[in-house]
Amino acid sequence: MPNAAEIVPDYLLIGHITHDVTPYGPHLGGTVSFAAHTAAAFGLKVALLTSAAPDEPLMERLPDSVMVVNIPAEHTTTFENIYTPDGRVQYMYHRARTLEVSMLPPAWRNARQVHFAPVAYEVDPAFADVFADTPLCVTPQGWMREREADGRVRQVHWSAAGQVLPRADLTVLSVEDIRHDPGLEAEFAALAPVMVMTRAEKGGTVYVNGEPRDYDAYPAEQVDPTGAGDVFATALHIVRHQLDDLWRALDVAARLAANSVTRRGFAGAPTPDEVAQALAAVGAPGKR
């Protein structure tokens, strides 16, 4: 049986899993975690390049089918959100290793789709050169933050945006990601061939070569919004590649994101049946 590092993935994720400190105990977090669950529901061969403590028990909460290369670190990237009368304060207590091109298994360079999903400025922008000819999704929130000496996370200017965004087939971010500088919406839309700015239950805006077009979200009874944006971005990237149709892919992604907020944690990731139903709703066959 071949080693996972020798298998060409359908969907390659690059970014840190995270240990999220919550009042209910530790939770597995990170965009790659929700994205892995989503891509697996599409029946794809999913691979993850990450860095975490070698004995991190939270890794067991990833789907069993996901092929993982974990670059061992002293600690897993660890976040905690503290809610105050003045709003949320985020702390990053630990950060695992920076992910570099040399860490990538050679076979994974031939992945059919790639998703850069940094949460702690951990993905080397040089990966964009490696995947210049591969359908690439970028969810850039983790490149727009840094950790201060006391662990507090602050928003910063993303200096490599001009290197990465023009190479990406799809860029997805939320209004929360740019709350510190709303002008970044226009700046990034001018760099990215296709960019989606999500606005939670209000839908969002799609920019194609800088031209905006709004879309609506599907209504849903919200229970837990965690991970819905990751479900949306991953589904949009996958279905756009399958159908070569941005607008039908957007509809599928919006349906799955609406389902996601009605359940807690990874239960919000789509099921294979939900994927099939969403594809059928836009007249597309399932890709199981």
Residue positions per predicted region:
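Conserved beta-alpha-beta core of the PfkB/ribokinase-like small-molecule kinase fold
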Residues: 113-186, 202
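Conserved phosphate-binding/catalytic region of the ribokinase-like
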Residues: 2-7, 184-288
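Short beta-strand scaffold segments in enzyme catalytic cores
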Residues: 37, 79-82, 203-207
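Short catalytic helix/loop segments, enriched in acidic residues and glycine
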Residues: 27-42
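Conserved N-terminal subdomain of the carbohydrate kinase-like
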Residues: 4-11, 19-24, 41-122, 127-137, ...
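Active-site metal-binding loops of divalent metal-dependent hydrolases
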Residues: 15-17, 231
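Active-site regions of enzymes building and remodeling cell-envelope glycoconjugates
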Residues: 63-71, 113, 133-138, 152, ...
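Charged helix-capping and loop-helix junction motifs
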Residues: 28-32, 152-159, 185-189, 215-218
